[in-house]
Amino acid sequence: MIIKNLQEFYRLLIPNKPLIAIDYGSKKIGVALSDQELSIAMPFNTITAVNKKVVITSLLNIIKKYKVCGIVIGLPIDMSGGVTQQTNIVMKFAEKLKQSLGLPIYLQDERLTTKSANNFLKSFGIKRKDRNHNDDAVAASMILEIVLNAIKRFNL
């Protein structure tokens, strides 16, 4: 199910199980995982978007292997908070994922995360080619970190 309220999402999570975060793009999908205590987010992987079936199968394998209990998906909205074409694409992907997995899904505003991730990697002198391969996973970890920080802030 797709949950719009963070407190409700948190109530549906299984204790001592990690979360997965997804930065969904048309060419690449960034993936991040939390630890079991939901205290830190780590970039995990970047999946090439061959087609939705391959992407969902790859995500399902990660979810099963790491016993993930919930999914955070970055929701791309424009700077004024409006819906874009990519917003609708991500919403459709979230619906497909919901049907395939049955885990709670929370959509998190992802404004500027990919740009921030790219700047972060650039600050370490990482070359453009390597940044472009890793920025989506780092962006996914930033999206997940926003959620984890909100959980801590609200003492959930």
Curated annotation (Swiss-Prot):
Top-rank EC class of the record's enzyme: hydrolase
CDD domains to which the protein is assigned, alphabetical: YqgF
GO biological process, one term: rRNA 5'-end processing
Enzyme Commission number, as recorded: 3.1.-.-
Any one GO CC term of the record: cytosol
Annotated keywords: Cytoplasm, Hydrolase, Nuclease, Ribosome biogenesis
Gene3D superfamilies in the record: YqgF/RNase H-like domain (3.30.420.140)
Subcellular location, record wording: Cytoplasm
Chief location bin: cytoplasm
Protein family per UniProt: Belongs to the YqgF nuclease family.
Chain's role: Could be a nuclease involved in processing of the 5'-end of pre-16S rRNA.
Protein name as it appears in the record: Putative pre-16S rRNA nuclease
Organism of provenance: Rickettsia prowazekii (strain Madrid E)
